[in-house]
Amino acid sequence: VYAEANNAEDVKRLVSENKVAAIMFECVQGEGGVNPLTKEFVSELAEIAKKEDILLITDEVQTGNGRTGTLYAYMQYGIMPDIVTTAKGLGGGLPIGVAMLGEKAENVFSPGMHGSTFGGNPIASSGALSILKRIDDKLLDEVNQKSEFIKNELSGAKGIKSVTGLGLM
């Protein structure tokens, strides 16, 4: 089921009406623009997941790996998801995806339970390691500085109604 973005009451209603295993969300909605979720809403998602004992999963496929000014966008929201997924920025153009499991979900998979034809590709894995080695405080500061510059320049431009985003998204 899908809930309306930034509407915690809609999420609560859907959780109460359905058998829900997880709440999965993107901190920045990338369809129809670049629209960050509010910090209040994401905090409420975390509270609902904790209260209902369901998994909280953040999809960082577009937002992860420094694109938002932190390693992952959720880090700007003061929450800790049970599962984090990431892909695009991790591979630097190479096909790779990762799901990182926290304590609540760490025992879901054991060696041999999940396989992939392309899993463990040595070139993509080397590329991902190279990307991760390059993401440091200096790079993240640069992302934030460029983000502020772009937002300030666009905000004053003629014909611009609003500027949304997070970091360089």
Language-model regions, residue ranges each:
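Conserved N-terminal phosphate-binding loop of PLP-dependent enzymes in the Aspartate aminotransferase
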Residues: 1-169
